[in-house]
Structures are given as structure tokens and as C-alpha cells.
């Protein structure tokens, strides 16, 4: 059986990645692709149990290193219980946030030692790197404004959305640095455009990547 394809959606608050991943999933289902839509933190029963602790801020008093450990534990369960089995059976996995969010949120703005983060990452993903990552880029002030409009008030903001604008700006820079360092995996999407325009960009990028894989998959399946 041919291996599937693992695509992650990344970006700052209010960039619209969750809207776009749902739109892409619907479009791919309509085209009869075997698609699994998932998210982080969460995505598996074990990881979902950790999700509330992380987003509510309950883990914040223990410091960024403990928070990073919790994210890694949740990710390991998610990878082994959901993502890896789906990719191995040939599915296309669409994941709302993955390792790049930890690199940025805990590693860069959390101030955790890069070597520690790299070790955690290796343990958590155990070789399950994304084949493609879409990084949704938007000015943090606009992203936070959109996030507030989406919720209707500041009352429902999670602990990450409540952080200072300077921190959000540092995260934007960190995501763009990842994209620049790994251009073979990452595509930066201008998330400031209207949702339909962004959808067109995402659709074109993903289907181009899938079509580029098709000849290789056909060669792999051909008799020798």
C-alpha cells in the first residue's frame, strides 16, 4: 500500500488556518480523497485529555518547560494513535498545528533551550515529519482583531491569545524563519487576503503537491 501524505497548518492567532483546513478537507472529501482532519493539542483521546490543561493556562504556573513536556506527551500519543496509522494506510492527514507551533510557542517565545526542544521533538514525533506545512502569515494586530471578532468578546480568549502584541510579533517572525530554513517543506500563505482568495491559494498548493507525488507513486507501484 502506498504511503499517505501528512500536511500541517501553522500560524499565529487569528490567521484563519482552522477555517482553511476545514474548507480543504471538505473539498478533498468531495473529490473522494481519503482524508483525516485532526488538530493539536488534541486529536487522540489521550491528547484531548491534556488539551484543556494547556489552553486554560492551568499548566502555566509550572513554567514553559513543563508545558513543553505536556505538549510533547500529547503529541506522542496523537502521532502513534492517529497520525502514523492513517499515513501508513494511505490517508491524507490534515493537522491543525503540529511541531512548528511547539518550536515557536514554547521554544522561541517560551525561552526553552533549543537542544531540549529538539530532543523533545524527536521523542514526540518519532520520525513522523510533515510532508508539507502551510504557514499562514498575518500581521499579529490584525490576527488578534479577527480572533476577537470571531469570539464576539475577549471572554473566550485562551491563554496564548491573551499574551502581549510583542510576543505575537516574535512568533510571527519565528514562523517565517522556519519557512525560510525549510523551503522544501514549508509554504507561506498570505492570510491577510479574503478567505476565498486564501482558499484558492491553499487548494492550488496542496493539489500541486499531490500531483507531483503521483508519478513517483506510480513508478513505485510499477513492476520491475
Curated annotation (Swiss-Prot):
Keyword hit for ATP-binding: yes
Binding site for ATP: 11-18
Keyword terms: ATP-binding, Kinase, Nucleotide biosynthesis, Nucleotide-binding, Transferase
Domain of life: Bacteria
Catalytic activity: dTMP + ATP = dTDP + ADP
Enzyme class, spelled out: transferase
One GO process term, biological-process aspect: dTDP biosynthetic process
GO cellular component: cytosol
Any one Gene Ontology molecular-function term assigned to this protein's record: dTMP kinase activity
Entry EC number(s): 2.7.4.9
Protein's job: Phosphorylation of dTMP to form dTDP in both de novo and salvage pathways of dTTP synthesis.
UniProt similarity note: Belongs to the thymidylate kinase family.
Protein name: Thymidylate kinase
Organism in which the protein naturally occurs: Mesorhizobium japonicum (strain LMG 29417 / CECT 9101 / MAFF 303099) (Mesorhizobium loti (strain MAFF 303099))
Gene name as annotated: tmk
Amino acid at each position: 500500500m502506498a504511503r499517505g501524505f501528512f500536511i500541517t497548518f501553522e500560524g499565529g492567532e487569528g490567521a484563519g488556518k482552522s477555517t482553511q483546513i476545514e474548507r480543504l478537507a471538505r473539498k478533498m472529501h468531495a473529490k473522494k480523497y481519503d482524508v483525516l482532519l485532526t488538530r493539536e493539542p488534541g486529536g487522540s483521546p489521550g491528547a484531548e485529555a491534556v488539551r484543556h490543561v494547556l489552553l486554560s493556562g492551568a499548566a502555566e504556573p509550572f513554567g514553559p518547560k513543563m508545558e513543553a513536556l505536556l505538549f510533547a506527551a500529547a503529541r506522542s500519543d496523537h502521532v502513534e494513535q492517529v497520525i502514523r496509522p492513517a499515513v501508513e494506510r494511505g490517508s491524507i492527514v490534515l493537522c491543525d498545528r503540529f511541531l512548528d507551533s511547539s518550536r515557536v510557542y514554547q521554544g522561541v517565545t517560551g525561552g526553552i533551550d533549543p537542544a531540549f526542544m529538539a530532543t523533545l521533538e524527536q521523542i514526540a514525533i518519532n520520525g513522523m515529519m510533515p510532508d508539507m506545512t502551510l504557514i499562514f502569515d498575518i500581521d499579529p494586530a490584525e490576527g488578534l482583531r479577527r480572533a476577537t471578532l470571531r469570539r464576539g468578546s475577549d471572554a473566550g480568549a485562551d491563554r496564548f491569545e491573551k499574551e502581549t502584541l510583542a510576543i505575537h510579533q516574535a512568533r510571527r517572525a519565528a514562523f517565517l524563519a522556519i519557512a525560510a530554513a525549510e523551503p522544501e517543506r514549508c509554504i507561506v500563505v498570505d492570510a491577510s487576503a479574503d478567505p476565498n482568495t486564501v482558499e484558492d491559494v491553499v487548494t492550488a498548493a496542496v493539489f500541486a503537491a499531490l500531483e507531483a507525488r503521483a508519478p513517483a507513486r506510480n513508478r513505485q507501484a510499477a513492476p520491475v
